[in-house]
A protein has these predicted regions:
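Extracellular/periplasmic helix-exit of transmembrane alpha-helices
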Residues: 157-170, 224-265
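Cytosolic C-terminal regulatory domains/tails of membrane transporters and channels
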Residues: 427-590
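Loop-to-transmembrane helix boundary motifs in multi-pass membrane proteins
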Residues: 69-73, 112-121, 214-240, 305-340, ...
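Helix-loop-helix junctions that connect adjacent transmembrane segments
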Residues: 146, 153-203, 396, 400
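A generic transmembrane alpha-helix motif of multi-pass inner-membrane proteins
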Residues: 347, 364-456
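Membrane-interface loop-to-helix entry segments
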Residues: 131-162, 228, 295, 348-361, ...
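Extracellular loop-to-transmembrane helix junctions
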Residues: 19-65, 71-76, 92-122, 147, ...
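Membrane-interface "cap" regions at the ends of multi-pass membrane proteins
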Residues: 1-14, 63-65, 69-77, 185-191
Length: 590
């Protein structure tokens, strides 16, 4: 909960100020609407997501299952772009906001007045913590969140007590409401219009699901408990902070350059409790803002290795933690330099990433319930519409968020496709298994030259194999009565990258056939030839016919659909998989 909370709870550092700038005196009412959306929208949705995806892949995994083949993977790449926007900007924005608290503290020397440099130091320190390991990150998160929440409970509680002691604050606030907005209906309508600007207060749910693999015991039940606890704590804190800051802080102090700008609760800490407590609160806020990136980093480290390497769209080293942490830290450096560590410039992209992921989660849950013929899809459909409205409103008002997300999406898609092309001639097989009949075929030919004829599956009747055998004997000058094995690979989901090759034997009128299915036919044949070599301790010879057609067209067909000019690609896969030519299965084309 604390690893999720450093992201979720840290928004208290700037959320009250954003709420007042967006809604003015309506800020507490708009915050109540946000809390209702949290408790009755986001929380039910992510409780369903946690049950459907206990490995931490979240709503993205659910949508991947709902859409087959390349369509599902294309959607995943787009959503990964928004997830990257959310998580990376969480890291950079929080560190930049921590920097703002540092350089504007009266006790900090002016030599630190370099936002980009200070932010990069904070990001490097965060990366170093994760390179050391998850356990250390969780331990630090627990300490930071416990102290920060304790200080906020005291600060908000004292603020409410101050309002109780001075009841004139309440009529002053209600008079401002009626003066500006006339009647309660108009107040509610305006609050519904402005509450999407407060969407940063929803930031912890996707991260909460993403870190599920770190939850011990009954993972789904405990994750739901974690999300529920975090949501309830944050709901109370959001409403309390909005009330005390709106009623106790002069409106002019919220303006840009004002004493409460970007640090409303810190303003109250200094104003009511003196510089010592105020500085302690500043240090706690700086710590949680800096470490807010920890939960985002955990989410990235969980998402990326589960998708891109499996799609063949990233090198295998991206499954390891330390290289990924180094890569993500370098990206955060770049983003910080591009945006000059400006918090406001990154805010739109942050909210856009959060809302798109939440909307996709609501869509995934609604579709899953609808497919299961459960009538509960109707309330989740309503939640989806509300999240959709919130997202569209945010995009219209802050289009820069979509632009930044588009940059992430294009970068992920382009680099993923390049990686897929570069890795297309890898073996792409996780293992080979053969049924008893296939094993018996291999045992029969183990003590004689092993000749394999590649056959494109057709009718599966005796005449097909008799014709193919005669053709191979004429083309390759095979001796009469030569014992051969036929190999057939049926194309499966071409969008998949690697899987276990399950080989089944078939006896068609005395012709022995080895059959399997694979997303990439040449790679499967290469893997099967290496398997035959290892099982029989002999070098197999495989016989192919030349393919009629343009080789460039067949190359593109292989990249997209896993089949094309089979023989030369099979030979290239074997060349990369087995570096010793003497041990490499032989390929014959005629």
């Amino acid at each position: 909960m604390c690893l999720t909370g450093v992201d979720y709870f840290s928004t208290l550092g700037y959320q009250p100020g954003i709420a007042f700038l967006a809604a003015g005196a309506l800020a507490p009412i708009a915050t109540v609407i946000l809390v209702l959306l949290t408790l009755f929208g986001a929380l039910p949705v992510y409780s369903k997501v946690a049950a459907a995806s206990p490995d931490g892949q979240g709503s993205i995994s659910m949508l991947e299952d709902l859409l087959p083949r390349w369509r599902g993977k294309a959607l995943v790449l787009v959503l990964l772009g928004f997830a990257a926007t959310d998580f990376i900007i969480t890291i950079t924005l929080s560190a930049a906001d921590a920097t703002e608290h540092i350089i504007h503290n009266p006790f900090v020397p002016h030599m630190f007045d370099h936002p980009v440099g200070v932010t990069i130091v904070l990001l490097a320190a965060l990366g170093a913590v994760f390179i050391k390991g998850f356990k250390e990150a969780i331990g630090i998160a627990v300490v930071i969140v416990a102290i920060y929440l304790a200080l906020n409970v005291f600060l908000i509680g004292h603020g409410l007590l101050e309002i109780f002691r001075h009841p004139e604050y309440v009529p002053r606030w209600t008079n401002a409401l009626y003066t500006q907005h006339g009647n309660p209906v108009m107040m509610l309508a305006l609050a519904l219009l402005v509450f999407p600007k407060l969407a940063l207060g929803l930031s912890g749910f996707e991260t909460g699901v993403a870190v599920m693999p770190l939850v011990a015991g009954d993972r789904v039940r405990n994750t739901r408990k974690m999300l529920r606890s975090a949501a309830l704590i944050m709901s109370v804190a959001l409403i309390g902070s909005s009330v005390v800051t709106t009623l106790l802080i002069p409106p002019a102090a919220f303006a840009e350059g004002g004493e409460a700008s970007g640090r409303a609760l810190a303003y109250l800490a200094h104003h009511y409790h003196g510089e010592l407590f105020g500085t302690i609160y500043d240090i706690s806020t700086i710590a949680i803002l800096w470490f807010a990136g920890a939960s985002a980093m955990a989410g990235l480290l969980n998402l990326v290795p589960r998708y891109l390497p499996r799609y063949g769209m990233a090198p295998e080293w991206t499954r390891a933690t330390r290289p990924l942490v180094t890569l993500f830290t370098a990206i955060t450096f770049l983003i910080t330099v591009i945006f000059k560590a400006n918090v406001a410039a990154q805010g739109g992209a942050y909210a856009t990433g959060v809302l798109v992921l939440m909307t996709s989660a609501a869509v995934a849950v609604t579709l899953a319930l609808w497919r299961a013929s459960s009538r509960s899809w109707i309330p989740f459909g309503v939640i989806t519409l509300i999240f959709g409205y919130t997202t569209v409103t945010n995009v219209i008002e802050r289009p820069d968020g979509v632009k930044i997300a588009a940059w992430f999406i294009v970068t992920i898609v382009v680099t993923s496709l390049i990686s897929r092309v570069l890795r297309s001639t890898e073996l792409r097989v996780l293992g080979v298994t053969a049924d008893p009949l296939a094993q018996s075929f291999l045992q029969e030919v183990a003590h004689s030259p092993i000749r394999i004829i590649a056959n494109r599956p057709d009718s599966g009747l005796f005449d097909e194999y008799a014709h193919k055998l005669r053709e191979a004997q004429e083309t390759h000058h095979l001796p009469p009565n030569t014992r051969v094995l036929f190999v057939e690979v049926r194309p499966s989901d071409a969008s998949a990258f690697s899987e276990v090759l399950n080989v089944a034997g078939a006896d068609i009128g005395g012709h022995h056939v080895l059959r399997c299915a694979s997303p990439a036919i040449p790679n499967a044949i290469a893997a099967l030839l290496l398997f035959i070599r290892d099982e029989t301790k002999q070098i197999p010879h495989a016989y192919f016919g030349w393919t009629e057609g343009n080789p460039i067209v067949y190359l593109l067909k292989f990249l997209a659909f896993g089949e094309g000019d089979t023989a030369p690609v099979t030979r290239e896969v074997l060349r990369q998989a087995e570096h010793d030519p003497e041990l490499r299965p032989r390929i014959h084309i005629g």
